[in-house]
């Protein structure tokens, strides 16, 4: 029987594998192309995972959030442009999205006033920044909903065949 790690500061890849009760050997067999030694290097942060390895782990562990984590925290481009998405319940995602959409509805006229001339003047800057931040919150809510959907599909909570049939109509 494999021993359980007692390491305190486990990274997300280590925690995810252990949450599935997989040894490194079993995870390697599941993924077919990543050796137990490579998994150990990734988990002990002696080596960063490659994007293709993260994609494979996300698929085989049924945790699409690993891709977002990698992009937001380990990819130099993603660190600058990709926000880390936190896993939330569907109701919380929808309520946050609706709150942001309602706020933007109230700001729609102001956005038109600010941008109609193609310039942002000093007296418009504060409102423009607020609107930008609200749009970013909407974007994050959309990404969170997408990640939630991917996880539900990966784990079988949402029937992938039905989902794809409806999506491809």
Give the positions of each predicted feature.
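A short, Lys/Arg-rich alpha-helix, primarily the initiator
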Residues: 1-19
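Short alpha-helical DNA-recognition segment
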Residues: 19-41
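DNA major-groove recognition helix of helix-turn-helix
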Residues: 31, 42-43, 53, 61
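DNA major-groove recognition helix of helix-turn-helix/homeodomain DNA-binding modules
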Residues: 52-70
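Short, charged recognition helix plus adjacent turn
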Residues: 70-99, 152-169
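Acidic, glycine-anchored loop motifs typical of Ca2+
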Residues: 86-89, 106, 112-128
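Generic structural signal for well-ordered, non-transmembrane alpha-helical segments
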Residues: 95-105, 129-143
């Amino acid at each position: 029987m494999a021993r359980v790690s007692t390491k305190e500061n486990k990274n997300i890849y280590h925690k995810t594998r252990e949450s599935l009760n997989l040894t490194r050997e079993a995870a390697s067999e599941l993924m077919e192309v990543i050796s137990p030694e490579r998994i150990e290097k990734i988990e002990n942060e002696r080596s960063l995972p490659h994007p293709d390895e993260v994609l494979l782990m996300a698929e085989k562990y049924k945790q699409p959030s690993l891709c977002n984590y990698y992009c937001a925290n380990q990819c130099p481009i993603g660190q600058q442009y990709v926000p880390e998405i936190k896993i939330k319940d569907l109701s919380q995602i929808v309520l946050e999205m609706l709150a942001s959409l309602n706020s933007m509805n109230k700001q729609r006229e102001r956005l038109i006033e600010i941008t109609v001339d193609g310039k942002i003047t000093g007296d418009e800057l504060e409102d423009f920044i607020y609107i930008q931040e609200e749009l970013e919150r909407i974007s994050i809510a959309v990404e969170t909903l997408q990640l939630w959907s991917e996880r539900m599909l990966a784990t079988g909570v949402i029937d992938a065949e039905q989902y794809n049939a409806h999506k491809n109509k």
